[in-house]
Amino acid sequence: MSNAKILATGKSVPDSIFTNEDLEKMVETSDSWITSRTGIKERRIADENTATSHLSVQAAEIALNKSGIEPADLDMIIVATVTPDMAFPSTACLVQDKLGADQACAFDLEAACTGFLYGLRIASQFIATDTHKYILVIGSETLSKIVDWEDRNTCVLFGDGAGAAVLGPVENGEEDKGLISFDLGADGSKGELLQQPAGGSLKPATLETVSSKEHFIKMNGNEVFKFAVKVIGDTTEKALKKIDKTTEDIDLFIPHQANQRIIDSATNRLGISKEKTFVNLQNYGNMSAASIPVALDEAIEENLIKEDDLVALVGFGGGLTWGSCLIKW
């Protein structure tokens, strides 16, 4: 069995920038209020003609071009999203068609903001067993389409975007590199803390569900905050323990970009410095499943990761779910 490694990454975000000042004109809020509580300054918003699959394809094409892998060489496409183009077919199948990846199986997975890490875990297992060689994992969201723009507690938080990674097996002599440790978890008993109540088989769309705004994101921010700070620390330490490492061994820590206060509290608990922590949420807000792959792509583009670095990807989200992935670069 061989480890999987990330061959290349790519990202796509909409051109439209929606600032805190723009939000001041819509709801009772202010730039200082949003910044002090979240760290977010702006977010990208997809137009009415842009769906999750469109951003996914754009990010995927960039990652494929960097990797040198042709779409026809892909064996699998995984799209992590809570905002698919439609209930079915899957967004991954739409991406497969648009890329021309006719040899790839394709499916979506839903683990909210942890989705990209779940996708990496699945892909790494298929590659490790030599049943699949090249796998495309995408985290992609158009959360602006399910945000209540009259709710100041949630509309300030979310943005749209997509990040993609092409995975393949490590080469001879690289056996100690690649995706070397994971920890994943879930607690469905806390599902109501972060949800989109209607639109599924439990509450199909009706005039009543639309008028009562049950198709928008609902969140208990205080409880999610407490959960996030604890679970970021727990999942990071579990993944490190599996490979006999500590937080001191981490060269770059890339957390889910949800809230600056969450990141600060979690990294303080872990003893990870600001210098080792990558943050870009000020530019994008919370992009759910796209958050971590977009951050990873930007960290690579900014030359913040060098050979043999230990990189930690750590996420949490609706479900509730959480996860961590350690990569020896």
UniProtKB/Swiss-Prot annotation:
GO terms for cellular component: cytoplasm. It is found in: Cytoplasm. It is an enzyme of class 2 (transferase). GO terms for molecular function: 3-oxoacyl-[acyl-carrier-protein] synthase activity; beta-ketoacyl-acyl-carrier-protein synthase III activity. The active site is at C113, H256, N286. InterPro entries: ACP_syn_III_C, ACP_syn_III_N, FabH, Thiolase-like. Its EC number is 2.3.1.180. GO terms for biological process: fatty acid biosynthetic process. Gene3D superfamilies: 3.40.47.10. Residues 257-261 are annotated as: ACP-binding. Pathway: Lipid metabolism; fatty acid biosynthesis. Pfam families: ACP_syn_III, ACP_syn_III_C. Keywords: Acyltransferase, Cytoplasm, Fatty acid biosynthesis, Fatty acid metabolism, Lipid biosynthesis, Lipid metabolism, Multifunctional enzyme, Transferase. It catalyses: malonyl-[ACP] + acetyl-CoA + H(+) = 3-oxobutanoyl-[ACP] + CO2 + CoA. Catalyzes the condensation reaction of fatty acid synthesis by the addition to an acyl acceptor of two carbons from malonyl-ACP. Catalyzes the first condensation reaction which initiates fatty acid synthesis and may therefore play a role in governing the total rate of fatty acid production. Possesses both acetoacetyl-ACP synthase and acetyl transacylase activities. Its substrate specificity determines the biosynthesis of branched-chain and/or straight-chain of fatty acids. Belongs to the thiolase-like superfamily. FabH family. The last Arg residue of the ACP-binding site is essential for the weak association between ACP/AcpP and FabH. Homodimer. This is Beta-ketoacyl-[acyl-carrier-protein] synthase III. It comes from Natranaerobius thermophilus (strain ATCC BAA-1301 / DSM 18059 / JW/NM-WN-LF).
